[in-house]
């Protein structure tokens, strides 16, 4: 696999403390605020007119929860991310035509949110391991493009 046993330990150790539902909504919300062009995929979600509107939007929270639960399932198949995300890749890439760059952006936002939630515990080693994971997931989601 692309993660060492030690890195897997760091990732799983932190992930076991993550409130997936809460962090998912926050990460997707921040994506839409920080990178406003990503909003075009969510036009059916209602009010995205301001940062406050986005962060409190129930549909954004619900989809963020879904996104992070999928990510969580992916962590259980860390050595076969392509397999774990094949169906989601097909949906997002072939049907919704999401630019794969957006998966990378969301991964980076997730890293920021985890740093924000965990402070000192999210040390450079943990960050490095998570950065590998989000890059791996992004590339698994994008693989239909290659």
Swiss-Prot record:
Biological process per Gene Ontology, one example term: hydrogen peroxide catabolic process
Top-level taxonomic group: Eukaryota
Tissue: Red blood cells.
Chain positions with Asymmetric dimethylarginine modification: 104
Gene Ontology molecular function terms on file: haptoglobin binding; heme binding; hemoglobin alpha binding; metal ion binding; organic acid binding; oxygen binding; oxygen carrier activity; peroxidase activity
Keyword flag Metal-binding: yes
Database matches in SUPFAM superfamilies: Globin-like
Globin domain residues: 2-146
GO terms under cellular component: blood microparticle; haptoglobin-hemoglobin complex; hemoglobin complex
Family matches, as InterPro entries: Globin (IPR000971), Globin-like_sf (IPR009050), Globin/Proto (IPR012292), Hemoglobin_b (IPR002337), Hemoglobin_oxygen_transport (IPR050056)
CDD domains the record matches: Hb-beta-like (cd08925)
Pfam families in alphabetical order: Globin (PF00042)
N6-succinyllysine, modified sites: 17, 59
Binding sites annotated in the UniProt record for heme b: 63, 92
UniProt keyword terms in alphabetical order: Heme, Iron, Metal-binding, Methylation, Oxygen transport, Phosphoprotein, Transport
Phosphoserine modification, residue list: 44, 50
Subunit structure: Heterotetramer of two alpha chains and two beta chains.
Function field: Involved in oxygen transport from the lung to the various peripheral tissues.
Family per similarity comment: Belongs to the globin family.
The protein's name in its UniProt record: Hemoglobin subunit beta-2
Organism whose genome encodes this protein: Panthera leo
Name of encoding gene: HBB2
């Amino acid at each position: 696999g692309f993660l060492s046993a030690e890195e897997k330990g760091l990732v799983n150790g932190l992930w076991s403390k993550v409130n997936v539902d809460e962090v998912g909504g926050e990460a997707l919300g921040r994506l839409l605020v920080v990178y406003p062009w990503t909003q075009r995929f969510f036009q059916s979600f209602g009010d995205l007119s301001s940062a406050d509107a986005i962060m409190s939007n129930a549909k954004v929270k619900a989809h963020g929860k879904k996104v992070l639960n999928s990510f969580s399932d992916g962590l259980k198949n860390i050595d076969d991310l392509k397999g774990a995300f094949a169906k989601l890749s097909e949906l997002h890439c072939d049907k919704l035509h999401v630019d794969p760059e957006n998966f990378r952006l969301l991964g980076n936002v997730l890293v920021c949110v985890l740093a924000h939630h965990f402070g000192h515990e999210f040390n450079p080693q943990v960050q490095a391991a998570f950065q590998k994971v989000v890059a791996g997931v992004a590339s698994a989601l994008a693989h239909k493009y290659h």
